[in-house]
């Protein structure tokens, strides 16, 4: 999606106005909001923020995006922002960026900084390799430097020339030196000199990621009565195991939870009280998997519980995870009772074919196909 379209959708959806906000005020506001969310300020100030803190944070995020869009477009001349399967992080006053594609496994670090370009590229490689798995330490929507020193989220996914996992400054710097010697490239990009390197994750990176989250997937799937192969299939389809996945809706994390819809339903189930999960909460893999499987449980046992056949219901749950249970039922009939009756009169295969043909949105129709195909690879 084009970055400007992305912005427009966010702004239309939120109704956020942009007048009267200067760049430094927006950045200061973002910083304050994050500190509040992370509990870094006094309780007197924090008590003035709504319980979830999500509405103010979302407004600030949207304002920041709107303020920075023209600056980024002017500097890079393209539309590269974070997406569900691609991590994008800008540093060096938006002159350097890292792009990690979790689907292909390609990693690209590039800079258009005209001064000390090789050093900036070297620094960008090191910070990318050492980006921590703790989401509170990484702001995808600013050019702030990454605070390293914790376990990197790429640990084990990238190996150096000794085939060793990279998790120390020494090893990251040495590998950056190697990349600058062997993979450095330069070209002319939108009238600017661009310096970049491209390297790759290990060949079986998605399997490695799946294994990393295996304990939590198994634990939460058993807890909520969800087949583990379905949980894995949804994670892969939604984010390709990108823990920093973020979409324009916005949805966050491995299972792409929308805070104000699935997030609220899952929060209520998990905490027995109303609430909305924050962005940083959903960027935590364990929390995200817990919420995602909880929402699958809600679809399975509440919204679509009247579907009698387990396999038929699973097809409906998969489609419902993407488009909502209401749209699933409307694919059969505008009346809920009649919709359930029609579903229960069909075989699982007939239901699958009907959904593939009659779901309102092409995305949902394709989603059902993708998840069921991926699911087969995770079946024992």
Where are these regions (language model features)?
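Short glycine/proline-rich turn/loop motifs
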Residues: 194-201, 270-279
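Substrate-binding/active-site groove segments that recognize
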Residues: 248-275, 290-298, 345-346, 371
